[in-house]
């Protein structure tokens, strides 16, 4: 079950990937790339549901990303209501992300000039890309 990673990669366009010379949408390589960009200042450009992250929250997201086992992606990704990887994708690619979890809207907003908005949704067992605007 790699639906989380499939959803994120389906929402990214060639222009997004070209920003970092990412040549293809290989999930393992993409996660490895994200892990190399896991730096404190990256998270300071993102608002989650309108709020900037606190220093401790950033540290916790960084720790989760650092310890993420890429080999486990085929067992699914437990998407958090404030997910460190979605924060990272939002900041790195300068994209807003609207995540609808069941009936709850969760917003990741890049503080700066955005390049687009990813609309995704999930439930207790599935995550998918819906559209990009």
List each model region and its residues:
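A recognition module on extended beta-rich or small alphabeta surfaces enriched in W/G with H and D/E
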Residues: 117-133
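Papain-like cysteine protease catalytic cores
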Residues: 10-109
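Eukaryote-specific, cytoplasm-facing alpha-helical/coiled-coil scaffolding segments in long proteins
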Residues: 109-117
